[in-house]
Amino acid sequence: FSIVIRPRLFHYLAILISLAGGIELINLFYRSGLKHVTFFILSLLIYAAFCTGFMKFGLLPYKLILFAFLILSIFDSFSQITGQLWGRKKIMPKISPGKTLGGVVGGTIVSIVSAFLLKGLFTGSVTELIVFTLGTLLFAFTGDLLSSLYKRKYEVKDFNNLIPGHGGFLDRFDSLISGGAWAALCFNLFLK
């Protein structure tokens, strides 16, 4: 709700989420006994790149932030629902066993339809709307997979138990961080 009520507050929230996620990455690395140093450094660099974009996302016009946030929420929700209903083929079972092709396709279709319904929040052309939406979804999905890969490498289910039953900050915000990074990049390159 800070997106609409106090848009500047969302920027500070983005910084807080980014810092908390970084602490989780470092904490998990230390809990592992400092294993896989090269993998950790590469992961931290990728995370820093996503977070840089995510913090810029927090400075975008509030309607665009709201649009991206709603599209990501719809994608996450409907990927899970359609995956449970029609998901047979696992995408990367060793990295993220719950992700199915049916879930990704279903979530993407519902998100694209929703993007057209939410067009009033988006100021660009139809082509820009489609590119923005598909890019946001692709980045969000990639961020989610990278988080899963990191957890598998360090042999844990969740980054931490901060939120019982939901894991830590990165378990909740990985898609938003990476999808927000694309939204900021796309806005600054094409939509300004």
Located regions from the model:
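Juxtamembrane boundary at the C-terminal end of a transmembrane helix
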Residues: 185-192
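Short, conserved aromatic-histidine micro-motifs
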Residues: 128-129, 173, 192
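Membrane-embedded alpha-helical bundles of polytopic integral membrane proteins
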Residues: 1-139
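Juxtamembrane interface at the ends
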Residues: 85, 148-156
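Interfacial loop-to-transmembrane junctions
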Residues: 153-176
